[in-house]
Amino acid sequence: MRSKGFTLIELMVTLAIVGILAIIAIPSFTEQIAKSRRAEAMRILGDMQLRQERWRSNHTEYGTCDELVAPSTCTAYNATIPHYSISITGITPTGHTLTATRKGAQSDDRCGDFVLTVSNGVASKSTSTGAANCNWP
């Protein structure tokens, strides 16, 4: 009579295969999640840059974060973004700096914070760490 079921060796081989696949897949999956969060930060920076240009077309200088997200506040706006906080500094009639600062689960991301600086109509993009392959389009 033949028993039905798995032997201990078959079960151990299956667990070993699953373990090896997990070791390979989890880092790749984690990096893809980080990439999607970085893309969201860049989308938000692009949106804020469009708001800045819209604001500047009607005023003598670029706007503050609170002015751009009115009637809300910048603090309330940032509360809706789970992985980055947006700030605007260096506001002049000819330029400004937008920064997406990491927070929460993204706080240890290798790419650091994303910075978009506009000066005299020329935009420059950078990261706080200078890391390569950080998805800036």
PLM segments and residue spans:
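Non-catalytic, surface-exposed connector residues within folded enzymatic/regulatory domains
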Residues: 23, 35, 108-110
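Periplasmic/extracellular, small/polar-rich flexible segments of pilin-like filament-forming proteins
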Residues: 56-137
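Membrane-proximal N-terminal amphipathic helix
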Residues: 33-61
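Alpha-helical interaction segments
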Residues: 18-20, 44-45, 52, 73-76
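N-terminal single-pass transmembrane signal-anchor helix
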Residues: 1-29
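Short, contiguous strand/loop micro-motifs
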Residues: 4, 31-32, 38-39, 126
